[in-house]
Amino acid sequence: MACSWTFLWLLWIALVAVLLFALRGPLKISESLESVTATSYFNNLTPKFYVALTGTSSLVSGIILIFEWWYFKNNAGIDAGDEEGSDNDESIENTKTVPECKVWRNPMALFRAAEYNRFRKETNSEPLTYYDMNLSAQDHQSLFMCDEDQGRAEYEIMQVAWRERESEERIQTARAALAINPECASALVLLAEEESETVSQAENLLRRALRAIESTLNSYSNNQIASYAQNGDAVRKRDLTIQTYIKRRLAMCARKQGRLREAIKGFRDLSRDQSLSTLLSVQDNLIEACLEVQAYADVQNLLVRYDGYGAPCSYELREPRSAAMSYTSALLKVRAVAENFRCAADSSIRRGLSSAEQTAIEALTRAMEFNPHVPPYLLELRSMIMPPEHFLKRGDSEALAYAFFHIQHWKRIDGALQLLSIVWKDFVPKVSKDKNAFSSQLESADKELLPSWHEQSVFPKTEGTLMMLLQTFICLAICILAVLAQQFPASSGEIFRTAATIGMQFYENSVYTVSQWAPGNIIPYLASKQVPVPEL
């Protein structure tokens, strides 16, 4: 931005110099300088001139002061801090200004073979990026592998399988591990994710993997399985994690096939173990399944239990944990008032609202402040793509991960999307004034998680440098035309009349060309009403 403004100032100075040089003859600048000496010029100045000069300089100084105050008010917090401050102060400032760019696993991630690969075959477009798939490979290694696997051939092979870049190579490596141990749960999970062409086939492989891992857990000498949070055997912890992962994917298969009660029961059973459910974000799956069966009271209890967000006036206490929590809480508040909302779309000040309506509007605003990329997808103002396997909180990737699964819940409630649209239209101009509310670091990080053919959501939209330069050139052209019109009124008037004549001729030629292709009565024909013919 600083470079563009410097360029514009230099361009302005250069254009003024060129303009003065071009008008040196008509303005008689050289003759005026030769005829009037500096001494006679200053002797002819009156006290009124000095008063006017003082007033003008004071006015200009005041304008500069106002613009400086406006600039520093809007750009406060960009710089790290004063140079005189201590290192501690600088580190505190940096932690406040730098946003969190941690990548989170999408708990609602689809099956690669049954869903992502079908999309790729139909559209010839890659739904996932290599960076996203590499993060998934790292997740699988941390969940399904441990240091005690050394010397066990099938698990050593699976370590190689998770690192393979191509899907076919991963499948072949997993088959090699199954050839050594037909009950290798990790290999069965990989085949369910990447080879099964339908959700039903993936469910069958996952059930087989669940039987294998439960048999392994029952074979331990100590039948009572230690909790994940306690210090215990690393292999047993790994097997417990695999068991939880498989149960979660089985519940997701039941959800996708319409067995909602079975899915909710599976998610509830998993949520009892706080450590594992938090690690895998099972609460998001449970909330979405409860929304599908319209168990809104259970959803409210889940929001209070897992996040504290959704309790009365909790939005005033702290930030929500995720877009799913914030927008689900807003949806529950909107549900109570959406049908009877009395606010006009173009009114900026809403009068006579009930406390429930004010609470719903505040909850929506709070959710939009956390992630403003969600409303365009819910309102279908932007085209939606398949969600990535990982997302960044407050980014476009999180908005896709939420809207892909929750848009039907908003459509089910009459008036919810209308109220969301009203609040969104009122929210955009207010937040667009604050350019520092959302960092551009999230946008650059989201580019690695989303496919290149996807048009990434940017909020707030900044004015491009090309548009700024175009506006500057238009202003300069108007200034030059005004100066020329003042200095050469006769010639300028003739030029303007010639330009107007050319414009009118172009318009008449265009109308004549169009009339040759279209009939003369096309406008009355389009404006006329079709008269229905009565049946005899």
Swiss-Prot record:
The keyword Transmembrane applies. Keywords: Coiled coil, Membrane, Transmembrane, Transmembrane helix. It is a multi-pass membrane protein. It is found in: Membrane. One of its GO terms (cellular component) is membrane. Its main location: membrane. InterPro entries: ST7 (IPR007311), TPR-like_helical_dom_sf (IPR011990). Residues 191-218 form a coiled coil. The keyword Coiled coil applies. The chain crosses the membrane at residues 3-23, 49-69, 465-485. Belongs to the ST7 family. This is Protein ST7 homolog. The lineage of its organism: Eukaryota, Metazoa, Ecdysozoa, Nematoda, Chromadorea.
